[in-house]
Regions:
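Residues forming anionic-ligand binding surfaces in small-molecule and nucleic-acid pockets
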Residues: 228-232
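Intrinsically disordered, low-complexity terminal segments enriched in Ser/Thr
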Residues: 43, 171-174
């Protein structure tokens, strides 16, 4: 009798706990949406992403899907995005939907981090991360598709300048009159390319002469060149951990630099933060894809680590679970990623970047998902080929990203 009463009491306690929990989550969700949709009419995202929702079912979808969710029509017709840039707004809206769908399909965690950014700051990170996702997806091609991958990457490399060159620039004459000129460089016929160009055009109108598109082109080209070198070397390994860190910094850190610069965040300290965080993300991604890469007879474990553990690349390609030598090599790469992550946060705190740039932390939310995966890797004793590491619990990830965004931390 006592045991049954105890069970009943426990059930009632749990029942009330879950009822309270879901009520709180629902209320937080409402507050979160209200914050996100406040004053959306004055942003670039308002013109690109305004779309009405016809049913309550669609509003109850995952929290991350608010990017194109409902927003009451604004009375104002103005926007920080200039409609005089000779872009068709309807087609541009479709382009951003395509970019969002690409990010959601191939890099879901980055998609969540992007959606947690304030609406008036979201378009730039979305376009740039979709571009990085697109180029990264090309490099996952097998060795037999090497030439095709190189052609695709070369196409992006050749069009980097036209993508990042604003379509419209405003100049002021000596008489005080403002004139707009349109560049003659052809824009690539690709949705993500048009998104990136729209962001560059908007940044030029906001920042004016402070925007240096040549620097953006240089950063993006370096990232694509690193991808091309990676594809070109095929199954060849990186010589050292330092080479792997350089690759990670080039492919992810450069995109972070452009993202911050587009939001007028530029300083030596912010560059260090972007560099360290990009390196941490790249190192972590090299481990996250270890199992899939092994099937394609490719690995990002550098030669110095494999030699130190007396393990061959063929052993890595087998993808055996529980191999202590591979665990040790994984631990060293993960430790390097943790070190760069800590350095990024330390630079952010020591230089008071949160006070100087209140919106900067949300642009760096990828640190949250990176740290979460590294913690999961440690939980499974750095056994990088475990199937559990390939799964991403969406609710837990959304919750963690939301909390960090709400706290304005990364």
């Amino acid at each position: 009798m006592y045991r049954n009463s105890s069970r009943l009491s426990s059930f009632i306690t749990q029942h009330h706990f879950f009822r309270i929990f879901f009520v709180v989550v629902k209320q937080i969700g409402h507050e979160f949406n209200n914050t996100i949709f406040r004053d959306r009419s004055n942003t670039l995202a308002s013109i690109i992403m305004r779309k009405s929702i016809g049913s309550a079912v669609r509003r109850r979808r995952a929290l991350c899907d608010f990017l194109f969710s409902s927003s009451s029509p604004s009375k104002k017709k103005t926007s920080s995005y200039s409609t005089s840039s000779h872009q068709n707004i309807d087609s541009l809206r479709e382009d951003f939907r395509y970019a969002s769908a690409t990010l959601r399909r191939y890099d879901y965690e980055t998609y969540l981090c992007t959606n947690a950014i304030d609406a008036n700051k979201r378009a730039g990170p979305l376009a740039l991360r979709a571009l990085n996702c697109e180029t990264a997806g090309i490099t996952t091609a097998t060795v037999s598709e090497k030439e095709i991958a190189l052609v695709k990457l070369k196409w992006w490399h050749e069009h980097a300048e036209s993508m990042l060159t604003p379509r419209t620039t405003t100049t002021t004459t000596t008489t005080g009159e403002k004139t707009k000129t349109t560049t003659a460089k052809p824009l690539p016929e690709h949705p993500i390319a048009r998104c990136v160009n729209a962001v560059a055009t908007h940044a030029k109108e906001v920042l004016g002469s402070e925007m240096n598109e040549a620097r953006y082109v240089r950063w993006i080209k370096r990232a694509i060149e690193a991808r091309m070198e990676d594809v070109d070397k095929g199954s060849s390994l990186f010589d050292s951990t330092a080479d792997l860190e350089t690759f990670a910094r080039e492919t992810h850190g450069n995109f972070l630099l452009v993202t911050l610069d587009c939001e007028n965040i530029r300083s030596m300290a912010s560059d260090h933060v972007a560099s360290h965080l990009g390196t941490a993300i790249g190192l972590t991604n090299s481990l996250r894809g270890a199992k899939i890469n092994a099937r394609n007879r490719k690995t990002y474990f550098p030669m110095d680590l494999l030699a130190a553990e007396n393990v061959s690349a063929e052993t890595v390609y087998e993808g055996q679970i529980g191999d202590e030598r591979i665990k040790n090599a994984t631990h060293k790469i993960a430790s390097a990623a943790v070190g760069h992550l800590a350095a990024a946060r330390r630079n952010f705190a020591e230089n008071n970047l949160g006070e100087k740039y209140p919106h900067m932390a949300k642009l760096l939310l990828q640190a949250t998902t990176t740290e979460r995966w590294l913690e999961k890797l440690e939980k499974y004793d750095f056994d990088v080929f475990r199937d559990e590491l390939q799964r991403t619990p969406p609710l837990l990830t959304q919750g963690r990203v939301f909390v960090q965004a709400w706290k304005n931390q990364f």
